[in-house]
């Protein structure tokens, strides 16, 4: 099983930059960048809440579970 972070697609859809999201959420730009490029193996739940609020979306819009084949 894998969890994909769809932050890059959502930001592109909204024409928002990583820097814009960092400013709106107060999350460090490096953390946003790691999530954007799917380089993190864990995510702070508070950050997910802040991101969903800033992007006006649900958790399922930025996270997806890919089952094992």
Language-model features: where?
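DNA major-groove recognition helix of helix-turn-helix
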Residues: 36, 47, 66
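The alpha-helix within a helix-turn-helix
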Residues: 11, 22, 52
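Short alpha-helical DNA-recognition segment
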Residues: 16-34
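Short C-terminal boundary/hinge segments that cap the last helix of small helical domains
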Residues: 56-69
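Hydrophobic micro-packing sites on short alpha-helices
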Residues: 47-52, 62-63
């Amino acid at each position: 099983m894998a969890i994909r972070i769809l932050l890059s697609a959502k930001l592109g859809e909204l024409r928002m930059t990583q820097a814009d999201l960092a400013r709106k959420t107060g999350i460090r730009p490096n953390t946003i960048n790691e999530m954007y490029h799917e380089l993190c193996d864990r995510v702070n739940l508070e950050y997910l809440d802040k991101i969903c609020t800033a992007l006006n979306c649900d958790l399922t819009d930025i996270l997806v579970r890919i089952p094992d084949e």
